[in-house]
């Protein structure tokens, strides 16, 4: 019951999380601000939601993780759901920063609980299920936000909050979840930032940087090629759907083949597929198949890295989950602004080709990670 409940909360948490970007034009009109000022809302939510995740995990490893896993999505839902209710921009900025803290608390504690309460021989599958549930929410977020706000106004978003509030209340009715024995100390926390977990983080960050840059640049690249908006939307949908399926498949395969084998294997195949994306004609319909294969392969390692980190640090599962999830994506995302300037200066292909080289050290880091004995069914 607990993994399924957490998967639902992940779907709804990330559904609400993805309300903000598509509604920026409406918020700009409401508050009379420009895009640069409105972008502060995105920055406030993203920074607290991503970069605070290891520290949210540090807290979750010391208190009742069930409480934090329930509180986090409630903060996100109330923050995003109330965007049409605040009279001042500054108030909304503070509320969304607080919502980001909620997202950080949920991802770290939720992934930790799923990894610990799933059957050990199926840990990879359940972490994949948890991850793909979040991807589903991210995909639906813009559709739901634009439909509700377009039909009934920004204020109507608040009526969606029971999607989170009711399951969160149900989670609170379950028994408390605290670690037995002595909690991890500060020296244990510092150990996470070196050794095998640090190698996993480095690998995941390099991989995220390459593919975040590619997927973010894709609409601009297509536009320079004269491809239609419809084909661009189709390509992004194919990539998003294949990423979700890849997440689900990756953890499941790692239960059978081993975590390290899946990580190294996906990176080994990922580089030639990535090069194919850069040099194969994007207007060819077969390009969509290549895009789907690459999207699935490069996202398959996300839950696998989390599962392996939890097995390497069983006393700090929330901390390492936060490090390998939001902190990885947030850290990689910080680099996209300078990458965008490089693309403007030198062109899409040279910059994306240069970024592809980063998959080689990512592969080497994955090869260097120690896999605990018998991760399949420990």
What is each stretch, according to the model?
Residues 20-21, 196-240:
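Extracytoplasmic gate region of multi-pass secondary transporters
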Residues 51-87:
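Conserved MFS/SLC helix-loop-helix module at the cytosolic interface between two early adjacent transmembrane helices
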Residues 95-132:
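Cytoplasmic helix-loop-helix junction between adjacent transmembrane helices
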Residues 129-173:
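Helix-loop-helix hairpin linking two adjacent transmembrane segments in secondary transporters
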Residues 260-305:
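C-terminal transmembrane helical hairpin of 12-TM major facilitator-type secondary transporters
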């Amino acid at each position: 019951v607990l993994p399924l409940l957490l998967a639902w909360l992940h779907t709804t948490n990330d559904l609400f999380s993805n309300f903000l970007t598509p509604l920026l034009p409406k918020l700009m009109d409401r508050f009379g601000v420009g895009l640069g000022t409105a972008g502060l809302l995105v920055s406030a939510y993203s920074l607290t939601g991503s970069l605070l995740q290891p520290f949210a995990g540090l807290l979750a490893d010391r208190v009742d993780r069930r409480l934090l896993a329930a509180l986090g999505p409630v903060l996100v839902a109330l923050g995003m759901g109330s965007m049409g209710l605040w009279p001042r921009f500054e108030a909304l900025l503070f509320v969304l920063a607080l919502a980001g803290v909620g997202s950080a608390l949920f991802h770290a504690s939720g992934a930790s609980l799923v990894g610990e309460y799933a059957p050990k021989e199926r840990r990879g599958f359940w972490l994949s299920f948890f991850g793909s549930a979040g991807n589903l929410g991210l995909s639906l977020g813009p559709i739901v936000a634009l439909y509700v706000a377009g039909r009934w106004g920004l204020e109507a978003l608040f009526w969606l909050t029971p999607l989170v509030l009711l399951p969160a209340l149900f989670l609170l009715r379950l028994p408390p979840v605290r670690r037995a024995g002595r909690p991890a100390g500060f020296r244990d926390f510092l150990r996470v930032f070196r050794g095998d977990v640090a190698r996993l983080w480095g690998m995941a960050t390099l991989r995220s940087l390459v593919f975040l840059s590619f997927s973010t640049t894709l609409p601009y690249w297509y536009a320079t090629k004269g491809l239609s908006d419809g084909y661009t939307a189709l390509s992004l949908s194919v990539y998003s759907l294949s990423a979700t399926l890849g997440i689900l498949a990756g953890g499941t395969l790692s239960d059978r083949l081993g975590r390290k084998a899946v990580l190294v294997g996906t990176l080994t195949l990922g580089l030639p597929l990535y090069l194919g994306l850069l040099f194969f004609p994007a207007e060819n319909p077969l390009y969509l198949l290549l895009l789907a294969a690459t999207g699935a392969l490069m996202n398959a390692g996300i839950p696998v890295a989390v599962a392996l980190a939890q097995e390497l640090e069983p006393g700090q599962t929330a901390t390492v989950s936060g490090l390998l999830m939001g902190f990885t994506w947030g850290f990689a995302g910080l680099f996209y602004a300078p990458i965008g300037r490089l693309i403007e200066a030198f062109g899409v292909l040279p910059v994306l080709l240069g970024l592809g080289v980063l998959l080689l050290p990512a592969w080497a880091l994955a090869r260097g990670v120690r896999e605990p004995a018998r991760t399949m069914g420990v």
